[in-house]
Swiss-Prot record:
Gene Ontology cellular component terms for the protein in this record: plasma membrane
Record's protein name: Potassium-transporting ATPase KdpC subunit
Source species: Escherichia coli (strain SE11)
Subcellular location, principal: membrane
Subunit and partners: The system is composed of three essential subunits: KdpA, KdpB and KdpC.
GO MF, one example: ATP binding
Alphabetic keyword roster: ATP-binding, Cell inner membrane, Cell membrane, Ion transport, Membrane, Nucleotide-binding, Potassium, Potassium transport, Transmembrane, Transmembrane helix, Transport
UniProt subcellular location: Cell inner membrane
Entry similarity comment: Belongs to the KdpC family.
Pfam families, per the entry: KdpC
Function field: Part of the high-affinity ATP-driven potassium transport (or Kdp) system, which catalyzes the hydrolysis of ATP coupled with the electrogenic transport of potassium into the cytoplasm. This subunit acts as a catalytic chaperone that increases the ATP-binding affinity of the ATP-hydrolyzing subunit KdpB by the formation of a transient KdpB/KdpC/ATP ternary complex.
TM stretches of this protein: 10-30
Length: 190
């Protein structure tokens, strides 16, 4: 019985620290120092939530830039089902999926001149990625310009405006947040 008391005391102490104090402290500090990020990085227009800056959306219309394909089951970009497809590079099913995506993108973008950018046909590890490279966005300009009656120059400037550089110049690559870019497109129509 004597040896049980220190073990029980340690258990209760660690339970209070790791199950109560630590989560409460991180929640309070997160809300205090980083309220936008701690609440999901929500993009709002007035009182309406239009999306999150961290999670992609399923834009399928010709007048929208499309992001990476989602690997989430049942519903695209479902944050509760986050995860990759887990198909190996050597898996023939992955080849079929990529070939089907390339064919669909070629059909939807007949005026695109170069090869389909790889990030438009491969899902990210989370299946929820909202960023593509500026080159992948530029590849889609002819389709979006035609659907929205906008000039190539207008869309090129919009992509440049919403391109984000990596925090460290030589680590990473510039990206465009598709959700923010498409919301900016909708504002052009207003």
């Amino acid at each position: 019985m004597r040896g049980l008391r220190p073990a029980l005391s340690t258990f209760i102490f660690l339970l209070l620290i790791t199950g109560g104090v630590y989560p409460l402290l991180t929640t309070v500090l997160g809300q205090w120092w980083f309220p936008w990020q701690a609440n999901g990085s929500l993009i709002r227009e007035g009182d309406t939530v239009r999306g999150s800056a961290l999670i992609g959306q399923n834009f399928t219309g010709n007048g929208y830039f499309q992001g990476r394909p989602s690997a989430t089951a049942e519903m695209p970009y479902n944050p509760q089902a986050s995860g990759g497809s887990n198909l190996a590079v050597s898996n023939p099913e992955l080849d079929k999926q990529i070939a089907a995506r390339v064919a669909a993108l070629r059909a939807a973008n007949p005026d695109a001149s170069t090869n389909v950018p790889v990030e438009l046909v491969t899902a990210s590890a989370s299946g929820l990625d909202n960023n593509i490279t500026p080159q992948a966005a530029v590849w889609q300009i002819p389709r979006v310009a035609k659907a929205r009656n906008l000039s190539v120059e207008q869309l090129t400037q919009l992509i440049a405006k919403y391109s984000q550089q990596p925090l460290v110049k030589y680590i990473g690559q510039p990206v465009v947040n598709i959700v923010e870019l498409n919301l900016a497109l909708d504002k052009l129509d207003e």
